[in-house]
Amino acid sequence: MKSDWKWDAFDPPERRVAEFLVQGKSNATICTEVFLSRARVQECIKRILIKTGADSTRGAIALLVEERETLSLLRVLQQATDGVVIIQDRLVKFANTALERIHGYEPNGMVGIPLVELMPPGSRNTTIKHYELRMRGEPAPTSYAIRILCKGGQEKDAMVASAGQISYCGRPAILGIVVERM
């Protein structure tokens, strides 16, 4: 599966140059540390701009800093005891270990799954309705009881709470918390 993370698109020299740019290092410093040629540094920065989709070095740095902060937050969310999910384009983009356990998936087994496949048919309309309302920035319930569908086909009762719309990889997404109800 193709990664959404800009850092993953860089080859090793680009990654080193990007690290130096994020740290605020000058082109002269980058020349001495990575390339001995100013032209090669400039060419590498051009490739970084293309791969990040930024129109300036400052814009690329801002995107990379935001991405790094997001990755740090995801590492924290991975440790949460409640299920945490990020949904973007109606697909699971992030699911922590607790959510994978609740749904019966192996680690990293939920990324890429359509949201509707995690709900039994009777819960799908409600879930999609709440997702669409949040994506449009309209009011939606902050928490609600729902049935979820596990990997093996069994259904469980759960509580879903949404933090609402967030930015994930530079685009709108929904952050949700799922707690299994016993």
Predicted regions and their residues:
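PAS/PAS-like sensory domain cap-loop motif
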Residues: 99-110, 121
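Recognition helix of helix-turn-helix DNA-binding domains
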Residues: 24-59
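PAS-family sensory domains
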Residues: 93, 142, 149-151, 155-157
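Short loop/turn elements at sensory-signaling interfaces that couple input to output
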Residues: 160-174
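Terminal output helix/cap of sensory domains in signal transduction proteins
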Residues: 122-150
